[in-house]
C-alpha cells in the first residue's frame, strides 16, 4: 500500500493592514468595517454566523501568534499524521515577512528537512537580500510573492514597501534556486501597459515560474463585501472582458511564464469551465430534464449557460446577480432578484455568504 502524502499548514496569525507594515494602497481589506456575520451553508440552521462567514472572511486574528503557540499547534498536527509529510506551508492573516519570529520559525521548520512553501508574502518585512540565501538553506522550495511592478519606486508608492530594492533583489535570488510565483494586482493607468510588459519581461528573465494577474476591485459588485468601497476613489477598473483579453495577450507574449488571472482567465486550459469546449466530457453529463433556477455571479453565468444548453437545458434558467464573483454573493444580492423569473427550486453557489433560512425567506416573500 502506498503511503499517503501529507501537506501541513503552519498558521502564524496576523491582521491584514496591521501585521504587514500597513495596507498596500489597493488592498481590498483597507477601510473594512466590522460587519456582522453574513451567514452561509456551514452555519447552524437556527443561527446565522460561523467561523467561515465571520472571522474567516475578514481574516480576523488578534495579531501574530507567539512562536511557542505556533510550534505547539504544528507539533500536535504533526503527531496526528500517519503518512509522509511532503510539504509545509506557512500562512496567516498577516505577512510572513513581517512575523517577528520569522527566522526562528524557519530555522525550526528547516530542521525537519521537509520542503517549505510560503503561501503568500509581499516581502515588505524583508530588508536584507541575505534572507533569500537563508530561506533556501532551510529548504524553502516555493513562494508566492506580490510584485506589483519591477519598478522599485512604484513598489514604494503603491505597496508602501520601505525597502523595495531589497525586495526585488530577494525575488531575483529566490527565482534562481526555487519555484517563485508572482502576484500582480493590475491598476489601469498605474502598472498596466508598458509597466506591466517591463515587469513580466523582468520576471521571465530572472526565472520566475508563473504569474497570477489580479484584477483590482473598487466597488461592491466586484466583490468588496466589507462595506469598504471605494478602495481608491476615482480609480478605473478593468471590465471583465478587458481583463480576460489582457490575460490572453500577456500569456501569448510571454510563453515562458505560466500566466493566469483572477477572477478569470487561464489561457492554458481555457478555463473557467474548460469542459464547455470538450464534447466528450460534456457528453458524460446527464441530460437536463427538470426545472430549477441556478443563481450565480456575472462572471460565471455565460459559461454555465453554455454547459446547460449543451445538455438540453434552458439557458434562461441561469440567473446572474450583479455581483461578479459567485462565492461572494450575499443576501443583498438575492433581494435584488425579480422573483417571478425564478423557478420553485433555486440552486445557490455552495460558497455564497447566504444563510439557508434567510435565503428561503427572501426568495419566498412573494408567496
Predicted regions and their residues:
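Conserved strand-turn element in the central/C-terminal portion of the radical SAM core barrel
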Residues: 170-195, 216-219
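Auxiliary Fe-S-binding modules of radical SAM enzymes
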Residues: 2-5, 197, 201-367
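Catalytic cores of alpha/beta
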Residues: 127-133, 188-206
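Flexible, acidic/Gly-rich N-terminal and inter-domain linker regions that tether
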Residues: 1-53, 345-356, 360-367
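Core AdoMet radical
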Residues: 9, 31-105, 109-127, 131, ...
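Active-site beta-loop-alpha junctions enriched in small/polar residues
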Residues: 15, 93-95, 121-125, 148-150, ...
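Alpha-helix-loop-beta-strand connector modules within alpha/beta enzyme cores
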Residues: 102-118, 165-179, 233-257
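Short acidic, S/G/P-rich loop/turn micro-motifs used as interaction or catalytic elements
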Residues: 94-98, 124-125, 150-153, 188-191, ...
